[in-house]
């Protein structure tokens, strides 16, 4: 199985980010997965504490983690989100240019232990199907009507 790299963008939500990364680390296939974290620079002082906590946490995780490789991009200025050359856009552009597939997530997701396996199998299964443009690991609790 091909293990797609994972991209995570973050800024200052330390507790959310830590849960996200640690749940990803517990996934089947994590040891074969490259992870790219893009830590944006705080736009103002009110974001500095959470940003510093994430930065310190990542310094420790870079040295000791359960991934094939943990790559951290520390932005030197605030890139923002949802605008040209924003933190999200820059990381996605890098992954798109260097890999034929990738997994992108927010920093507040907590993953099931089979998440990576599920997504990677889906990416392989539908690789050549032009009708499929993405594999999703979330299902909104929609009130399905079960019939006979």
Regions inferred by a protein language model and the residue ranges of each:
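Hydrophobic targeting segments
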Residues: 3-8, 24, 34-37
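Conserved donor NDP-sugar-binding/catalytic core segment of glycosyltransferases
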Residues: 114-148
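Short beta-strand-to-loop acidic/aromatic patch adjacent to the donor-nucleotide binding site
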Residues: 99-110
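Acidic donor-binding segment of Leloir-type glycosyltransferases
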Residues: 27-73
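Alpha-helical scaffold elements adjacent to nucleotide-binding pockets in ATP/GTP-utilizing enzyme cores
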Residues: 20, 91, 118-122
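Short, well-formed alpha-helical segments that are part of the catalytic scaffolds
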Residues: 13-26
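Active-site nucleotide-sugar/metal-binding loop of Leloir-type enzymes
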Residues: 89-101
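A short, glycine-/small-residue-rich helix N-cap motif at loop->alpha-helix starts
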Residues: 77-87
């Amino acid at each position: 199985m091909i293990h797609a790299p994972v991209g995570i963008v973050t800024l200052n939500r330390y507790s959310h980010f830590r849960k996200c990364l640690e749940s990803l680390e517990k996934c089947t296939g994590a040891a074969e997965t490259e992870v790219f974290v893009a830590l944006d620079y705080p736009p103002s002082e009110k974001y500095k504490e959470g940003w510093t906590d994430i930065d310190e946490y990542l310094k420790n995780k870079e040295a000791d983690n359960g991934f094939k490789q943990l790559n951290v991009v520390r932005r030197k200025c605030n890139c923002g989100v949802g605008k040209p050359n924003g933190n999200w856009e820059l990381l996605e552009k890098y992954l798109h240019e260097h890999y034929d597939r990738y997994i992108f997530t927010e920093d507040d997701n907590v993953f099931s232990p089979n998440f990576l396996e599920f997504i990677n199998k889906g990416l392989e299964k539908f690789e050549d199907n032009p009708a499929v443009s993405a594999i999703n690991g979330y299902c909104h609790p929609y009130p399905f009507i079960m019939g006979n």
